[in-house]
Amino acid sequence: MEKKKSMFVEQSFPEHEIGDTNKNFDEDGRDKRTGTWMTGSAHIITAVIGSGVLSLAWAIAQLGWVAGPAVLMAFSFITYFTSTMLADCYRSPDPVTGKRNYTYMEVVRSYLGGRKVQLCGLAQYGNLIGITIGYTITASISMVAVKRSNCFHKNGHNVKCATSNTPFMIIFAIIQIILSQIPNFHNLSWLSILAAVMSFCYASIGVGLSIAKAAGGGEHVRTTLTGVTVGIDVSGAEKIWRTFQAIGDIAFAYAYSTVLIEIQDTLKAGPPSENKAMKRASLVGVSTTTFFYMLCGCVGYAAFGNDAPGNFLTGFGFYEPFWLIDFANVCIAVHLIGAYQVFCQPIFQFVESQSAKRWPDNKFITGEYKIHVPCCGDFSINFLRLVWRTSYVVVTAVVAMIFPFFNDFLGLIGAASFWPLTVYFPIEMHIAQKKIPKFSFTWTWLKILSWTCFIVSLVAAAGSVQGLIQSLKDFKPFQAP
């Protein structure tokens, strides 16, 4: 039998020496990178404007008109400031001509080394796993919201319309199993652009509905400078815990430092240099998301007041027009399908690259096979990729089914990852790269910023843990709420 008639054809790819540059390969021997600051911005917007935007009205309600926007702006500034430091560390020791570092861990190894590399890996991959679980929860909530919205429209708003999240988590997992066979970040640009468009759609719909609700008057909506009122809305202890949790939710809403290096590794070599292109992408991405966050958070709070739901599109702050709310929730689900891939690709590539280094001659791990699909063309299949990525998606879906707590889960992820990944490591690497003298003015204020963010992360984590404990008391897994 001729080899070309076989469904599977093993591929053999030539090795390319570092420095072998031509139109198909970069100086490190890898396929030529084609990303620009615009595709980088799309990746960032996909990563940042995620499920976090939906809880911002609730977060502003806990903090009030003064502290709410102030905390949003503070996290925005800190995230952009430290992302510029991280962008300069993609190459080492020189940010323009140095050796490429392909992952966050490699960057930390180049500049800091030692035990900090393991701590970075624990924080980064733990955070990425948590985010993919959180996105599974959120996507299923949005899918359920479509079904419940139609039920309310048909039967009235007083009907319970209880629907289990579990079947929709299974649907989401099946889609992710298929998309997870996309080999790497370099093939994700189209999905990120689609997801970014979806995020603009549902954020705009949420803002529009909030403006219409606030302008329409109706029932009295109570907002205050300090948020929910002790003795009326909550007890003193609840106010403290909710404030901490709201800070964690806002921190989560700016989570993209975990994938910044992987995004930067998709950008083509200059001019402009990768670090300049990444800084521009970060500026556009963070500015755009902050604008939408301010709109969604503040307009949502104006519409719902201190009774703002934890997720203002699925918590049924709105019932009509039901078709528009359905469309917004479909946009959320589509966006999170793409966002899930942005955050899980670094996990996939870490396991696969480590396996290939340890067992380079194992065909199960390193073999690539071409499969011809009628009407669709040829696809490359790797058995490790197929088994490992499928298993990962299934496990995250099962965990999401057991712990479907939206706000508390987001707050805990944000609190646990914000300080080490967004603040501590970028600042420490910047100090090492620029050789900033200890106890100098710059060194001192960078350390003050780092420790301040550490304290904020601690209190936010405490609030989220308390919220999870409260949610677990009456929860029964795999059942409709």
Swiss-Prot record:
Cytoplasmic side: 1-36, 79-125, 189-190, 264-283, 343-385, 428-447
Matching InterPro entries: AA_transpt_TM
Induction of its expression: Down-regulated by drought and salt stress.
Known tissue expression: Expressed in roots and leaves, and at lower levels in stems and flowers. Found in the xylem parenchyma.
Membrane topology: Multi-pass membrane protein
Transmembrane segments: 37-57, 58-78, 126-146, 168-188, 191-211, 243-263, 284-304, 322-342, 386-405, 409-427, 448-468
Subcellular locations according to the entry: Cell membrane
GO biological process: aspartate transmembrane transport; tryptophan transport
Membrane topology, Extracellular segments: 147-167, 212-242, 305-321, 406-408, 469-481
Any one GO cellular component localisation term in the record: plasma membrane
Molecular function, one GO term: symporter activity
Alphabetized Pfam families for the sequence: Aa_trans
Effects seen without this gene: Larger seeds and rosette leaves and increased number of cauline leaves at flowering. Decreased concentration of lysine, phenylalanine, leucine and aspartic acid in the sieve element sap, but no significant effect on aphid feeding behavior or reproduction.
Keyword Cell membrane among record annotations: yes
Primary subcellular site in the record, as a coarse category: membrane
Keywords (A to Z) from UniProt: Amino-acid transport, Cell membrane, Membrane, Symport, Transmembrane, Transmembrane helix, Transport
Keyword Transmembrane helix: yes
Protein role: Amino acid-proton symporter. Stereospecific transporter with a broad specificity for tryptophan, proline, and neutral and acidic amino acids. Has an affinity for aspartate in a physiological range. Involved in the uptake of amino acids diffusing out of the xylem tracheids into the xylem parenchyma.
Entry's family note: Belongs to the amino acid/polyamine transporter 2 family. Amino acid/auxin permease (AAAP) (TC 2.A.18.2) subfamily.
Protein name: Amino acid permease 6
Species per Swiss-Prot/TrEMBL record: Arabidopsis thaliana (Mouse-ear cress)
Lineage: Eukaryota, Viridiplantae, Streptophyta, Embryophyta, Tracheophyta
